[in-house]
Every structure is written in C-alpha cells, then in structure tokens.
C-alpha cells in the first residue's frame, strides 16, 4: 500500500473545470476511498503560472472548489508551483518530512514518461514509485490535448536537467554561509580546502546542508549534490568539470591520474594543472598531500581499516614513484575526523592500533577501546619518512571531532546510515 499518493493535474485546463467536475470528483473520490485510510500524504500537483484565453476570457490556475469539491479537497494537499521541477521538489520535501518512501503517482498517460524523467533526476532508489493512469477525456477537455511521449530524447532530457538546475540554483543556502577550512602548510600554488556542513541546499536533517555525496541508500539525489559542488567550485575557484572524487573501498589502492581508473580506490595523485581531486570524509580522515617542488598533489580517504593498511603512505609512495617527489618536500594535512572521544572498536580490532603505538588506544583493557586514528596516521607518516613539521593534524579547526560538533560536520558515528559527507580537496592552479 502506497504511503503517499500524488495526482498529476499539471496539464489541467482549468477553465474547463466548470464542465468537468464529475471527472475530477470521480478521480479524487477513488483515491480518497482506496488510500485515505493508510496513505499518510495525499497530494494534488498543479502549475501556478499557466494561463490562456478561451472565447476572449483568460483563466488562471486555481482549482475551483464548488460542486462538491470543497469538502473532498480537504483530504488533499495542493502543491502549485511555476515549474515541474519546483513542484516535484516541494512534494519531495513534504514526503521526506514524513519519512515516506512508497509513492503512487496517478498521471495522465501522455505525461507518464515525462513524469518518470523528472522523478529519476530528483529522487533516489530509497523511494519506490508505482504509476497509475489518470483516465481523462480530451473532448470537452479536462486536460490540454498533447502528443503522448514514449521516449525522452537526449535534447528533452537536457531540457529537464536545465529546468531542475535552474531551480536548484535559486534556492537559498541553509545553516549559514559556505565555509572552507584551509591550511597554512599548503603553498599558494595549490587550491585546497576542507568543507563543513554549512552553505548548501540539502535539507534532510542528517544531510543538511552541504552534503557532497549521493548514494542509492540516501535521500539526496545527484542533482542536489552537484549544486552543492557547483557552489563550492565557485567559492574555491576550481573547475567543477574537472573534479574527481575517490571511489572509496576502505583499502590502500591508489589511482595515479592518467592511468586506467580502478573500480575502487582510496587515494588519488596527479600533477595535472586545473584538475581537482577530493577525498570523502564523515568521521574517516580526508587527507591532502602537496609537493610544491615537483608540483604534484594527492588525496586519501583514511578510515580505521585504510589507516592500518597504510593508505596515507601508499599515496606518498605513489607521488614519489610517479612524479619523482622527495619525502622532505611533501606536506600532509589531515582534515576533520572522529576523535578518540567518540570512536571505539572491539578489542581484537584495537590490538593492531595498540601494536602500532600504545598512544593510539585509550582504555585498552575495556571491551571497546577508544581509537585515535589521527595519531596512528601521523605515526605511520613519520615512520615512512615524512618530516614531523610537514604534517598538520592539530590545526584548531581541523582537529575538531566530527561527531562532537554537529553544527559544523557530518558524522557516521553520530548520525547513522543516512549521514552526510564533507570532503578534502586540492588542485594545482593553472
């Protein structure tokens, strides 16, 4: 049984309602009868800016509530916006507020393919959609006569994407201004930074607002994440078309840009100017590497598994092997991550950190000791030959525990599976 039912009246010829109340009443009565008891959200979607003239009379898009409609409409929420993108996004917000995922869309057959194309852009696999034909008669007209669309062309899809992108760009930033944390250790020939959770448009509580990763298991669609990324690129000054994220696998695999890209990897290195590379983080450490002498850079994603596997030094070694970097020239900055105050592991997993150095573990004799992955990363980098003064892990902003600061950072430990993601990024200026 659907948790939400949407009725698409977006193509409604509203001046013809005077002659079509019975058709509309029949549809709404059927929905109310079959779904009102169990569905938590009944919605009519329509357009607020379509108007046209007939017999010299101009009509606007307000659903009339005479002839028995008034009482019935009390069961439905009417969402009326100037565009399909705005309407569906508003409906998505209402669905997400109620944490619903099973949705029935009752839509005229000639609009079904178009509706599916918009939904594919604005929703993720978290949602389960089913479609039902809205039976309409064009003679005497409840709906505008139009050609049934069976396939969306590439040009039409781009038009849909442009409409959505234009709408998303108009949305205000949430939770304050966009904030980028930088390090004085990284020379000015690089663009770099670490994002926080403020200044984006994501509205899901655990993803709000500057989420930078979309997953089939989360409610933030790619188009929203891409808009957040566009705003970051404008603020930081990099080219969003040349942006690459790590494909995390909690390993020590490194992609050397220019070679064949692996299916998954937890580090990237490059010496290409104008290319921005990024490591994800939401408790795991996003690490940025820079060599101002050889003009090369890298990023790594270090969770507790990747830390023990040596992903940080694997990134350093890739820079040395590929670009001729020297250990003494490479600087390393650790981005925000979970602290030992909030991160524990079972004792059998904690033993590996204790064997690396006892200072990496607190309360070792407990069933779930506290782990300091930042300290472990520094120790491994120093053991690998990186100069201690070339490692920054204690910057006042960068050293904040992601789990302890919900106003600033996303956290898997704190927020559970539907967590948001921040990044560390770097590029060589063109």
Curated annotation (Swiss-Prot):
Expression across tissues: Ubiquitously expressed, with higher expression levels in immune-related tissues such as lymph nodes and spleen. Expressed in both intestinal and peripheral myeloid-derived cells.
Keyword annotations: Acetylation, Cytoplasm, Endoplasmic reticulum, Hydrolase, Immunity, Inflammatory response, Innate immunity, Metal-binding, Nucleus, Peroxisome, Phosphoprotein, Transferase, Zinc
Cellular component GO terms held in the UniProt record: endoplasmic reticulum; nucleus; peroxisome
GO molecular function: adenosine deaminase activity; copper ion binding; guanosine phosphorylase activity; purine-nucleoside phosphorylase activity; S-methyl-5-thioadenosine phosphorylase activity
Binding site for Zn(2+): 250, 284, 301
InterPro entries (UniProt xref): Cu_polyphenol_OxRdtase, Cu_polyphenol_OxRdtase_sf, Cytotoxic_necrot_fac-like_cat
Keyword Hydrolase part of the UniProt annotation: yes
Reaction(s) the record says it catalyses: adenosine + phosphate = alpha-D-ribose 1-phosphate + adenine; inosine + phosphate = alpha-D-ribose 1-phosphate + hypoxanthine; guanosine + phosphate = alpha-D-ribose 1-phosphate + guanine; S-methyl-5'-thioadenosine + phosphate = 5-(methylsulfanyl)-alpha-D-ribose 1-phosphate + adenine
Principal location class: cytoplasm
Residues annotated with N6-acetyllysine modification: 247
The record's account of how the chain is modified after translation: Phosphorylated on tyrosine residues.
Biological process, per Gene Ontology: inflammatory response; innate immune response; nucleotide-binding oligomerization domain containing 2 signaling pathway; pattern recognition receptor signaling pathway; positive regulation of cytokine production involved in immune response; regulation of cellular pH; regulation of inflammatory response; regulation of purine nucleotide metabolic process
E.C. numbers: 2.4.2.1, 3.5.4.4, 2.4.2.28
Compartment list: Cytoplasm; Nucleus; Endoplasmic reticulum; Peroxisome
Induction text: Up-regulated by phorbol 12-myristate 13-acetate (PMA). Down-regulated by PPAR ligands. Up-regulated upon pattern recognition receptor (PRR) stimulation.
Record bears the keyword Glycoprotein: no
Superkingdom, natural source: Eukaryota
Reported effect, residue 254 to V: May influence susceptibility to juvenile rheumatoid arthritis; increased adenosine deaminase activity and decreased adenosine phosphorylase activity; reduced ability to promote pattern recognition receptor (PRR)-induced cytokines; reduced NOD2-induced signaling; does not change interaction with FASN
Disease per record: Juvenile arthritis: A rare, familial form of juvenile arthritis characterized by autosomal recessive inheritance and onset in early childhood of symmetric, chronic joint inflammation. It causes joint swelling, pain, stiffness and restricted joint movement. JUVAR has high clinical variability. Some patients exhibit systemic symptoms, including quotidian fever, erythematous rash, generalized lymphadenopathy, hepatomegaly, and/or splenomegaly. Others display polyarthritis without systemic inflammation.
Function of the molecule: Purine nucleoside enzyme that catalyzes the phosphorolysis of adenosine, guanosine and inosine nucleosides, yielding D-ribose 1-phosphate and the respective free bases, adenine, guanine and hypoxanthine. Also catalyzes the phosphorolysis of S-methyl-5'-thioadenosine into adenine and S-methyl-5-thio-alpha-D-ribose 1-phosphate. Also has adenosine deaminase activity. Acts as a regulator of innate immunity in macrophages by modulating the purine nucleotide metabolism, thereby regulating the metabolic function and bioenergetic state of macrophages.
Family: Belongs to the purine nucleoside phosphorylase YfiH/LACC1 family.
Subunit annotation: Interacts with FASN. Interacts with SDHA. Interacts with ATF6, EIF2AK3 and ERN1.
The protein's name: Purine nucleoside phosphorylase LACC1
Organism: Homo sapiens
Taxonomy of the source species: Eukaryota, Metazoa, Chordata, Craniata, Vertebrata
